[in-house]
Amino acid sequence: MLAKRIIPCLDVTGGRVVKGINFEGLRDAGSILEQARFYNGELADELVFLDISASVESRKTTLEEVLKVSGEVFIPLTVGGGINSVDRAREIFMHGADKVSVNTAVVKEPELISRIAEKYGSQAVVVAIDVKKKDDRYMVHTHSGKIPTPLEAVEWAQMVQELGAGEILLTSMDRDGTQEGYDNDILAKVSTSVHIPVIASGGAGNLEHLYDGFTRGKADAALAASIFHFRQYSIRQAKQYLRDRGIPVRL
């Protein structure tokens, strides 16, 4: 079995790392560079940098910030926020990213997934899917969760796989920032409906939640923010906890 990954996420706006609840009520979570340096030395498997206001404000991710972070970390770096063209993806890669995360733009223009994948490889394309439960259906939202779409989560996940995505970052908007655990129902449905890796996101509040995301949710990786940003747990602690319970991790 492949090692499961632990991935801290830097949600960035206004030049700072922030964290909210249900995509709202943002609070400051520190310096971008300080957090990036910390995770680089903390056994994180990868780092995700998401400019969470770029799509909402119809602007591009700040390349200067991406360059600074890429110069500080020596683990795979995924960058997302406002990436709406192959040219923009190229700029992000040129500034040190290993992968790009696309969301709003590819809901509007799904073929963008294929165009980026053809140029840079599927392994470099992460499609972020933000979902909210409504009447027992999990619906995809865009613009940092602000705009609902008619797309259902499993259907969209299968579509992005066919278009060339190499990975899916699945976030439960209902669980985001609540620390109540991942939504393992939709996580398992998506994970078992595709053959590309799925990253669990939204709701991690303790180490058992990470374990549940891997066992009940069938995830390939677990993304978390609050529990690591505010030093509730270290990534080393998380990995040791998982290893002790039979989950393969890199230590």
Swiss-Prot record:
It catalyses: 5-[(5-phospho-1-deoxy-D-ribulos-1-ylimino)methylamino]-1-(5-phospho-beta-D-ribosyl)imidazole-4-carboxamide + L-glutamine = D-erythro-1-(imidazol-4-yl)glycerol 3-phosphate + 5-amino-1-(5-phospho-beta-D-ribosyl)imidazole-4-carboxamide + L-glutamate + H(+). GO terms for biological process: L-histidine biosynthetic process. Pathway: Amino-acid biosynthesis; L-histidine biosynthesis; L-histidine from 5-phospho-alpha-D-ribose 1-diphosphate: step 5/9. Keywords: Amino-acid biosynthesis, Cytoplasm, Histidine biosynthesis, Lyase. GO terms for molecular function: imidazoleglycerol-phosphate synthase activity; lyase activity. Its EC number is 4.3.2.10. Its main location: cytoplasm. The active site is at D11, D130. It is found in: Cytoplasm. GO terms for cellular component: cytoplasm. Transmembrane segments: none annotated. Heterodimer of HisH and HisF. Belongs to the HisA/HisF family. IGPS catalyzes the conversion of PRFAR and glutamine to IGP, AICAR and glutamate. The HisF subunit catalyzes the cyclization activity that produces IGP and AICAR from PRFAR using the ammonia provided by the HisH subunit. PANTHER family: IMIDAZOLE GLYCEROL PHOSPHATE SYNTHASE HISHF (PTHR21235:SF2), IMIDAZOLE GLYCEROL PHOSPHATE SYNTHASE SUBUNIT HISF/H IGP SYNTHASE SUBUNIT HISF/H (PTHR21235). This is Imidazole glycerol phosphate synthase subunit HisF. It comes from Chlorobium limicola (strain DSM 245 / NBRC 103803 / 6330). The gene is hisF.
